[in-house]
Amino acid sequence: MPAAIPAFWSPRIGALEPYVPGEQPRIENLVKLNTNENPYPPSPMAVDAIQQAAASGLERYPDPTSLALREAVARRHGLQADQVFVGNGSDEVLAHAFFAFFQQAEPLLLPDVSYSFYRVYAQLYGIDCELLPVDEGLRIDVDAMVARARRGSAGLVIANPNAPTGIGLPLARIEQLLAACPERVVLVDEAYVDFGGESALSLVGKYPNLLVVQTLSKSRSLAGLRVGFACGQAHLIDALVRVKDSFNSYPLDRLALAGAVAAIEDEAWFRTTRDKIVDTREGLSLQLEDLGFEVLPSQTNFVFARHPRRDAAELAALLRERAVLVRHFKQPRIAQYLRISIGSREQCGVLVQRLQEILDRP
């Protein structure tokens, strides 16, 4: 009987290759450095706001416009509330953006090494994609993207800083992409920008084709709450609202709305924890280099590294045996790299110790 179940599926579903998230295992004393979670708890103000929101009002639907949160995001970034869209994590925001903007006659342009969910969204919505190779240093080849975009496309999507490489682009290069694609949307996914990248939010007023997507999962320690947002000119936000209200009018619950507003407003907590992560990242990069790893320059809360004499998949497996979890990707161009989330200083110390033990083995 199970073999017959796919007969009920829509044809596109059978062909889908869904995104595979990093595992969330239950291993005692695990050092978990595989999903780029923040090692520090969220703002106490956010926790208090969530607890207060849970105390009353849960029998009522939340605000379908999420106005208080959109206003908080707008205040933080010098925008207007009608330039902000919010959703149940940046993945949902990205999915709505793909549906709203990229179902065109021409292909959507993506770097060949980037967040793998982009290709899943495209496949889900029947969007044709063209993958443009990153350069030998695994940097997004802006010149190649500009040249290709000028011949026509459905738009561009890049992560900046890029994932899983951690390498960022300066704003001048983002502006080149925007200028090359004036009739289509350029989506800049800034999930990791708070750890050292240059945000394109300052360009929203200048470019009607720019959509910037961010998340509260990483730098605000709210991965368990699922809150993301997009910023762009009002006509882009209107399109996202139309998609949202055709799918789920209430994507953010009362607890998420309350916690997210408080987390955004607690600037001091954000800066303190963010600075700890950046400092730990720089120290870990040096320690990995001392162990013989090649470490790409990172502007994120992770590092991307390879060892010239050891297989990355084997290293990941040996670390897992020692209760240290990192992320390995099988994609050919990056199959010899490990993506290592920046944990606490103590967690990173355990990682380095375990790697030293593995590398010392004959």
Each language-model region and where it sits:
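N-terminal "arm"/small-domain region of PLP-dependent enzymes with the aminotransferase-like
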Residues: 1-60, 152
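PLP-dependent aminotransferase-like
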Residues: 100-158
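Phosphate-binding glycine-rich loop
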Residues: 67-107, 309
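PLP-dependent aminotransferase class I/II
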Residues: 209-289, 293-296
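Conserved PLP-binding catalytic core of the aspartate aminotransferase-like
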Residues: 277-278, 288-322, 338
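PLP-dependent enzyme catalytic core of the Aspartate aminotransferase-like
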Residues: 172, 317-322, 327, 331-362
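Active-site phosphate-binding strand-loop segment of PLP-dependent enzymes
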Residues: 136-194
